[in-house]
């Protein structure tokens, strides 16, 4: 996809609260009024605990009408609880002559949401002394009901409610908070008790079981950690079980705070309750206040020390809960994010009891819970960040980038150390010069030839404090474990240019050894002053405002055993005799003379520090008659019998983003979704994937896929390569063909930004080997029929050092040479694949060489859209020439206002100004077939929709092969064909696209298989049926 960097940067300057931008496949810009949005790339809570217990959330009804809330729920949770909407007060509308009347519409919406998205729902609650209307206990004259009458009414209520949702609610809190340990018999003196005595408890469970025999039935209460209350609950439930009452579990609410109860007190209750045979435990209402009970404190912002205390306690709780996963089957948080918490309204003051801040950003508590899960992830991105989107990325006419002017600093006299055993990569996550929080994210790289004990390593970040205050630092997340990172604030004896302090980052022994060529992975750091007053970063030595992605920053220095081995200290910097030390202080360092070790050779291995090689699974794709391979004849793609076919497909990304599976499988069923794509007429699936992921697979390394196993139980226990095998097999079964697309080099959600097919560590040879390996794995299966070699090679020759070019040279940046080399190596393994080759960004005008630095000397268009070089320098694959397909990308004015989108543009003007000179001539002059690999956008009722209609119609008229961008809901500038549940289709957009899908004269969609029809609905056909019915050939136009 394309990006408009000027639009992004200008808005980053305007929007002060955006601390960083997370990218997946492409970058999006955000208007001024946009609030901080969730980071969709961070690990899913429920996925992280899929082997332990369900992770649920209580939500109010308003969440069901908020797309962001719904998407947050579906990403992180596989169970929901209606916060109030399924309580008696919400359901009961009144009495009638025949019984009770109800308001079910909101509760129905909750149950439908859970059912539609294939997640669980807990029913809360049937019997409670609170939030039950007073009239329920009275007759029509306002007099209290008799015991028998009240029990009869309760029975009707339970039958009506539980019966309505039979088979849809997996667990009910049947009786809630019936215990008061201060009473002589410990039963709460509620109206229930006053009329019925404790008998109502037994009856409620019996009737709930009769109404739905398969639902799990729970007794639910708070303060279950108090010994007296705990013991009575234990005895009551044990007695109920002994009498044969159908009770299946105890709900421990766990409304706790940072100081009480202790984790051991919670554990003691779990131990006791789980000793009752046949009883399971649900943590039903978990939240953790920053205040002690009865505290008069009222914070306007959350104190950092309390947030850290909260995160540590959450980690300890979840670590403990995992020990009891055989009895603890569900953990539900009572709220989605802090400003939704009941604690704010109940006590009338700010509180931050949950895992996400008000702006959906992940708190330290979230990362603590993730860390406790034991899940490792290559590059989580904590908030605040904008929504992760994949958006098309244009190449605009050069526009000056808006950046702050850096303040000059004097040249230091200290000697830089840059050739040692380690170096530091830095990413600035706070771009505002005035800020109350400094956010340097770091990676330590072992650039030497031997391993290094990280406990010997320290890093210094140099800055000015701008007003003496106590300071605190924290690692929100670190791949080596945040608990293994230490901090120390060191004041200099006298101020120097750019610094009067440095923050020293160290490592505990648990961080382990750093191997040659590897890095520590991301270390996310932030620090602040105790009163949250501002720093001015503008003059800080270590701050590089524009380095928002990882790069080498020599002003962040590194030391081994106190000896400078990387970077450049500010001139004259020496520590003061006294130091301000963070809570995780390490001993005072002794400064040693600067030493420049002997340079070690640079390693080129891909960093994979947390992944363990395993044997490569054998492909499970069965052998089949491989007669669906396709070939090139002039400007047509034909089958084995020389009959023209029409490839009309769609993109579904995720294998390029770190999801390690298609995005959306965190909420949808993989197989069902692939079948529905085929049912709706798409006969080709373009699969964006990273070369790094393929190379990892080839080395026996399988990054974990982000899958909702509740929705996809058949994928349980499968690694990412095995899941990809299932993708291929499922596509085979539904007649859907696949085109692989090397969308990016790295799987870091930003690799696509790099313009070519290699980077400083990933060599062209690595790129070729990745393509060869995956070709060889599936060479005997004609489900994968095409290989799009590299997504959008690009770069501006007039300003970029590295850019993709197109000529007959063997230059490392010559995309034509790289494409020919890669294609031949692929075809030597599988000569049957179609080779799809995209264009570049800029091509020189006549008599201009690639050395020109004038933008006016080049023709520029969308990334991947410039195929002008084919006329003079066509791809030459020798004996494989009948496999070459060219593939431009094209987008509309909502992505970027290209010069051809002038007022009143027409289809003919687009053809003359853009399409024909850049790529359409290849089809018109019968040079080769075209496959438009990406096109799509929003139906805005304006110019973008007009462009989409013109291109769609041009595609249809000429039977141009295409793959629409895209299926995904999370594609920012284009939108997708489905909503964020990845199951609800945008019918308006689909109807718009439908005419561009291959259909016969009866409107049946045509697949590219010769035996299997397309899809599973019995309505579509295959190539053989199409031609047996004497249907017309879908032939492209030519002059």
From Swiss-Prot:
Residues 375-417, 587-625 are annotated as: Disordered. Pfam families: CBM_3 (PF00942), Cellulase (PF00150), Glyco_hydro_10 (PF00331). It catalyses: Endohydrolysis of (1->4)-beta-D-glucosidic linkages in cellulose, lichenin and cereal beta-D-glucans; Hydrolysis of (1->4)-beta-D-glucosidic linkages in cellulose and cellotetraose, releasing cellobiose from the non-reducing ends of the chains. Residues 1-28 form the signal peptide. Residues 39-372 form the GH10 domain. Residues 418-571 form the CBM3 domain. GO terms for biological process: cellulose catabolic process. The active site is at residues 177, 285, 792. The keyword Repeat applies. InterPro entries: CBM2/CBM3_carb-bd_dom_sf (IPR008965), CBM3 (IPR001956), CBM3_sf (IPR036966), GH10_AS (IPR031158), GH10_dom (IPR001000), Glyco_hydro_5 (IPR001547), Glyco_hydro_5_CS (IPR018087), Glycoside_hydrolase_SF (IPR017853). Residues 375-392, 587-609 have a biased composition (Low complexity). One of its GO terms (molecular function) is cellulase activity. Its EC number is 3.2.1.4, 3.2.1.91. Keywords: Carbohydrate metabolism, Cellulose degradation, Glycosidase, Hydrolase, Multifunctional enzyme, Polysaccharide degradation, Repeat, Signal. PROSITE patterns: CBM3, GH10_1, GH10_2, GLYCOSYL_HYDROL_F5. This protein is made up of two domains: the N-terminal domain has exoglucanase activity while the C-terminal domain is an endoglucanase. In the N-terminal section; belongs to the glycosyl hydrolase 10 (cellulase F) family. In the C-terminal section; belongs to the glycosyl hydrolase 5 (cellulase A) family. PANTHER family: ENDOGLUCANASE, MAJOR EXTRACELLULAR ENDOGLUCANASE. This is Endoglucanase/exoglucanase B. The gene is celB.
């Amino acid at each position: 996809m394309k990006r408009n960097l000027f639009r992004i940067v200008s808005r980053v300057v305007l929007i002060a609260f955006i601390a960083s931008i997370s990218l997946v496949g492409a970058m999006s810009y955000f208007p001024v009024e946009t609030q901080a949005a969730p980071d969709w790339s961070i690990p899913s809570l429920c996925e992280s605990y899929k082997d332990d217990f369900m992770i649920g959330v209580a939500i109010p009804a308003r969440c069901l009408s908020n797309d962001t809330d719904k998407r947050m729920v579906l990403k992180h949770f596989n169970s929901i609880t209606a916060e109030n909407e399924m309580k008696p007060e919400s359901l009961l509308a009144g009495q009638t002559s025949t019984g009770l009347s109800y308001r079910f519409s909101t509760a129905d919406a909750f149950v439908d949401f859970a059912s539609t998205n294939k997640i669980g729902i807990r029913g809360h609650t049937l019997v409670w002394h609170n939030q039950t209307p007073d009239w329920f206990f009275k007759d029509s004259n306002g007099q209290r009901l008799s015991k028998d009458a009240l029990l009869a009414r309760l029975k009707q209520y339970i039958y009506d409610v539980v019966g309505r949702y039979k088979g849809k609610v997996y667990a009910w809190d049947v009786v809630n908070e019936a215990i008061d340990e201060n009473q002589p018999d410990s039963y709460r003196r509620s109206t229930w008790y006053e009329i019925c005595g404790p008998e109502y408890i037994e009856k409620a469970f019996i009737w709930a079981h009769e109404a739905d025999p398969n639902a799990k039935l729970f007794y639910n209460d708070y303060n279950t950690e108090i010994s007296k209350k705990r013991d009575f609950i234990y005895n009551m439930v044990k007695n109920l079980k002994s009498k044969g009452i159908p009770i299946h579990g105890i709900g421990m609410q766990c409304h706790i705070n940072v100081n009480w109860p202790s984790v051991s007190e919670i554990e003691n209750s779990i131990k006791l309750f789980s000793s009752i045979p046949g009883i399971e435990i649900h943590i039903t209402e978990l939240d953790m206040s920053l205040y002690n009970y009865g505290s008069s404190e009222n914070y306007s912002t959350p104190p950092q020390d309390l947030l850290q205390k909260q995160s540590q306690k959450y980690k300890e709780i979840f670590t403990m809960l995992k020990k009891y996963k055989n009895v603890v089957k569900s953990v539900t948080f009572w709220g989605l994010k802090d400003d939704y918490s009941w604690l704010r309204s109940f006590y009338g003051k700010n509180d931050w009891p949950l895992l996400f801040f008000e702006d959906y950003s992940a708190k330290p508590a979230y990362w603590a819970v993730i860390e406790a899960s034991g899940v490792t992830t290559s590059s989580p991105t904590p908030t605040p960040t904008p929504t992760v989107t994949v958006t098309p990325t244009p190449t605009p006419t050069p526009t000056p980038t808006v950046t702050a002017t850096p303040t000059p600093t004097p040249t230091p006299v200290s000697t830089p150390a840059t050739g040692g055993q380690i170096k530091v990569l830095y990413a600035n996550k706070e771009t505002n010069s005035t800020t109350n929080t400094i956010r340097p994210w770091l990676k330590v790289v072992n650039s030497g030839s031997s391993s290094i004990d990280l406990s010997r390593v320290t890093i210094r970040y140099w800055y000015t404090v701008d007003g003496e205050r106590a300071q605190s630092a924290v690692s929100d997340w670190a791949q080596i474990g945040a608990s293994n990172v230490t901090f120390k604030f060191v004041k200099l004896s006298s101020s120097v240019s750019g610094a009067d302090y440095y923050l020293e980052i160290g490592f505990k022994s648990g961080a382990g050894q750093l191997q040659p060529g590897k890095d520590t992975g991301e270390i996310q750091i932030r620090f602040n002053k105790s009163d949250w007053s501002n720093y001015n970063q503008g003059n800080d030595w270590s701050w590089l405002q524009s380095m928002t992605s990882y790069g080498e920053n020599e002003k962040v220095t590194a030391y081994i055993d106190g000896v400078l081995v990387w970077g450049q200290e500010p001139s004259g910097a020496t520590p003061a005799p006294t130091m301000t030390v963070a809570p995780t202080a390490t001993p005072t360092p002794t400064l040693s003379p600067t030493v420049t070790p002997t340079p070690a050779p640079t390693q080129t291995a891909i960093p994979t520090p947390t992944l363990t090689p395993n044997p490569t699974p054998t492909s499970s794709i069965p052998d089949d008659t491989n007669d669906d391979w396709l070939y090139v004849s002039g400007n047509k793609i034909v089958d084995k019998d020389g009959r023209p076919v029409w490839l009309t497909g769609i993109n579904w990304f995720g294998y390029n983003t770190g999801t390690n599976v298609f995005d959306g499988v965190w909420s949808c069923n993989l197989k069902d979704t692939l079948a529905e794509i085929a049912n709706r007429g798409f006969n080709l699936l373009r699969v964006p994937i990273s070369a790094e992921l393929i190379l990892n697979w080839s080395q026996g390394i399988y990054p974990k896929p982000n899958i909702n196993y509740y929705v996809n139980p058949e994928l349980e226990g499968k690694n990412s390569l095995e899941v990809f095998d299932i993708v291929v097999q499922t596509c085979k079964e539904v007649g859907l063909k696949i085109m692989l697309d090397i969308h990016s080099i790295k799987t870091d959600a930003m690799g696509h930004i790099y313009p070519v097919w290699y980077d400083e560590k990933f060599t062209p040879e690595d790129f070729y080997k990745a393509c060869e390996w995956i070709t060889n794995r599936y060479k005997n299966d004609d489900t994968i029929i095409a290989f799009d070699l590299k997504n959008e090679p690009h770069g501006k020759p007039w300003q970029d050092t590295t850019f993709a070019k197109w000529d007959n040279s063997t230059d490392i940046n010559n995309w034509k040479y790289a494409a020919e080399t890669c294609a031949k190596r692929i075809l030597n393994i599988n000569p049957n694949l179609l080779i799809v080759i995209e264009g570049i960004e800029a091509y020189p005008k006549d008599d201009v060489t690639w050395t020109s630095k004038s933008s006016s000397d080049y023709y520029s268009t969308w990334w991947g859209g410039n195929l002008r070089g084919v006329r003079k320098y066509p791809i030459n694959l020798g004996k494989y020439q009948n496999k070459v397909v060219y593939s431009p990308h094209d987008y509309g004015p909502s992505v970027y206002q290209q010069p051809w989108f002038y007022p009143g543009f027409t289809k003919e003007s687009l053809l003359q100004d853009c399409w024909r000179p850049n790529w359409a001539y290849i089809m018109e002059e019968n040079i080769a077939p075209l496959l438009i690999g990406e096109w799509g956008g929003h139906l805005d009722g304006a110019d973008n929709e007009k462009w989409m209609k013109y291109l769609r119609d041009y595609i249809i008229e000429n039977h141009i092969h295409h793959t629409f961008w895209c299926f995904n809901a999370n594609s920012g500038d284009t939108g997708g064909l489905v909503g964020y549940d990845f199951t609800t289709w945008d019918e308006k957009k689909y109807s718009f696209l439908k005419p561009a899908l291959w259909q016969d004269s009866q409107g049946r969609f045509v697949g590219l298989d010769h035996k299997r029809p397309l899809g599973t609905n019995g309505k579509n056909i295959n190539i053989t049926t199409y031609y047996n019915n004497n249907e017309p050939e879908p032939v492209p136009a030519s002059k």
